[in-house]
Amino acid sequence: MIESFKSQKDMKRQRYQEVYMRSNWRKQMMISALALTLSATNVAPVFASAAPDGKTNAADIAQTMGTTAQWNRWEKEWETLKNDWTQISLSPGSNATELNFAWYTPKQTNDDHSNANVPKLIIGEGHNMKNAKVYEAEQTAVKDEQDNNGETYNSNKVTATGLKENKTYYYSYDNGNGYTKPAEYTTKSTNNFSFAFVGDPQIGSSNELKGKDTKEFYDAQSNAVKSDAFNWSSTLNAALEKTDDQLSFVVSAGDQIQTTKKKLPNKDASKSEIEYTGYLSPEALKSLPVATTVGNHDADNANYTYHFNRTNASELGSNKVVGGDYYFKYGNALFIMLNTQDTNVAEHKQFIEQTVAANKDCKWRIVTLHQDIYGSAEHSNEPEITNLRYQLTPIFEQNDIDAVLTGHDHAYSRSKMLLGGTKANDYTDDEFDAELEKDMDAGENPTTKTVAPGNIKNDSTDEKDQKYLAYLKSIMDEKAIETVKKQGSSVINPEGVLYMTAGSSSGSKYYDLVPRQQTYIAHRWQEDVPTYSVVDVTENSLTINTYRTDNDEKIDETFSITKSKGDTTSLNAEIKASESIVKQKDAYTTESYRVFEQALTGAKEVAADKKATKDEVENALKVLTNAKAGLEKKATTKPATVKKSTAEKKVVVAKASAKLKAGKKKVTVKIKKASVSGYQIKYASNKNFKKAKTRNTRKTIYTIKSLRSKKKCYVKVRAYKIVKGKKIYGSYSKVLKVTVK
C-alpha cells in the first residue's frame, strides 16, 4: 500500500540500494557457500556461476566503425583531460526558450560563502555573439571533495533565457582559467522535433576491479573510463548523424557513471569525478542538452547534483542526497523525470498529478525512470522491480501517460501497449535470488552470453522450482495487454502505456535477456553492442526507431503511436508537418519517398473531401504517419561511387569469396583470406535479405549463432580496407544458402 511506503521510506530506500548492487556479487556468495559446504565433506568443489557480463572494448568498436584514428587521438588526449573536473553539462530548460548549464571551477577562496570571483557565462547569436547576455553563476560548494593536488571546487549553474527557435547561438564560460573558446548551440523547432533516448552510459563500468586505494585500481578505472567514454561519444555521434544534427536533446534513463560512493576507496566522493569527466567529455555534449535520470549508481553521491542543472526540480521523490523528481516541456510534450531510487510512491504520485495538472496543454506525456519495470533482462523479474511496477502503473494510467522510458538492465526491450497490470503473487527477494542462481547457472568456466540459460524446467518436482515458475507466470501480465487498432507499425488512439527499456549506450556492461520472454514484450534485443533510439514527435504521432551504434542498423521495427479524433483537424496538421519533407525529397531513397508522396497525395484528397467518413480520415492519417516513419535517408557515402582522395583512388578491394557450414542452430562462414582490414557478413532468413543482420570481423572464420533450426540462412560477404579512418568496401560475394541444423 502507498501508506505503508511512507512509514517504511528509509528502510525501503536502503533495501533498494542493496538490491540493485546484488547482481555483481550474487554469484560470488553462492560460490563461497558451495565451497564451504563441499570442503566440510572433503569433496572437491565445482565452481559454476552465471555467465559473465559482456562489455565492448573501444578499440574493437573503433575497428568496426572505421574510427581507429579517432581512438588513437583520444587515448593521448585522455591523459591530459582525465584530471580536468571543469567540463560543462547542458540540460533542457523548463521549456524550449531556456537552456541550463552546470560546471565546476576551482575555489578562489576557502570561504564557502564567499562570492568573490563568481564565474559568468556569456551567450549570444551567431559567431559574433550578437545581442549577448551575461549571466552570473549561482554557486554551490562541492562538499567533501578535493582533487589529487588538494584543490577544492565550486559548482556553478546558469539558466539562459529568451532563446529563439531555429537559431544558432555561441556561448563561453569562465572555467577558472579564463573564458573558454565559444561553443555552438542551435535551437530546434518545437512543432516537430526529435530526441534521442539512451540507457546506462555507466562510464567506468568496464573496470572489473573493486574500489581499493591502490594504483592498480586507479589505473584500471582510468582505462575503463577512457574506453567507455569513447564508446559513449560514438553513440552520440551516431545519433546526431542519423538525424542530420536535428536532435533537440537526449533523455538518459540513469546511471551516468559506475562507482557509487559506498564502493569508492575510503568512500571518498571525489574518486568518481574521473568518471564524470569521461561522461562529459564527448564533443557532442557541448551542443546537445541531456535530461538525466537518477540511477542506482548515481544515487548516493551528491556530485550528481553538482554536475547537472535540472529544471523545475522538486523535493518530492528525493532520497535526500541527489534531489527528487523534475520535469520540462518541449513543444507539445511533457517530460516527467522520476527519481525512483526514492521508493515513496505517494510522493511520485503527488508530483505527477501536480505536474500534469499544471501542463494540461501538452498532448504527449512521457515519463522516465531508471528501473525497467516492464523490461526483459536479468533485473526485470526481481520482486523489488515488480513491486515498484504494480504501484506505479496505476498512477501512469490515471494520468494518461503515453510512454515510460527506462534503463537499468542494459538490454533493449519494447512492451506491447499495457493497461491494468495487477500483482498476483507474493514472492520474496531471498526466494527469488536462490532460484535465479540455479536457473541461470552457466556451468564451469562460463563464457559471455546474450540470453541466460533456463535450467529450471516446467516439469520439475522441486516445490521451490514450481513456486519460482508460478511467480514468473504471474508477472507476465498477459491480461494487461491492450487490444489496439493497428495500421502497419502504428497503434491508433491506445488507452494503454508503452514501456521501453534502453540497452547500454556505451557498452560498458551488458546483461543477459531472461530465458523466458515475458508475454508483455513485443520485441527485445541483446547482442552486446551499444544502442540508441531516436524518437520523433509531431502533433499527432510519436515514432520510435532504435539502432545499434556500430553499423546504424535498426534492431526493431519502426513503432508509432498515433492520436486522432477522426476529424480533419489532426489530418491537416500532419499534412502541414509533412510539407517540409517535400522540400528535402532528394535526401531520401526513391522508393521510400514514392510511398510517402502517394500517402501525402491521398491524405490531401481525403482532407479536401467534405464527405469523407471518420474511418477514411483516420486511415489516411495512419497511412501518412507510417509513410513518414518509413522514409529512408540516402547514404551519405556510397562505397562504389564515393568521391575519393588521391590516396583512396588507388585502393582496390577484391570481391570476397566464402563457404558455409551448417551446425546446430548456427552457421559457420569461412572466408577466403585477402589482404584487407576486415570483412562484413550480411545474413537473413530470406533471399531478399529483408530484416538482414550485419556482422563485422577481422577473422576469416566467423560463426553466426542463435539461429532457428531447419530454417534457411542466406549469407553474403564483402571485404573492406580502412584508409584514413574510412572504410572502402569491395563487392559482395554471391549469395550463399544453407539449412540450419
Q: Where do the protein language model's features map onto the residues?
A:
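Beta-rich interaction/scaffold domains
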Residues: 565-644
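Short beta-strand segments within Ig-like beta-sandwich modules, predominantly Fibronectin type-III
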Residues: 148-152, 693-698
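Pro/Thr/Ser/Gly-rich low-complexity, intrinsically disordered linker/stalk tracts
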Residues: 75-99, 642-675, 727-741
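Extracellular low-complexity, O-glycosylation-prone stalks/linkers
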Residues: 117-129, 675-694
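Beta-strand-rich modules
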Residues: 166-167, 704-725
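Divalent metal-dependent phosphoesterase catalytic cores across multiple superfamilies
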Residues: 60-293, 299-321, 350-354, 385-399
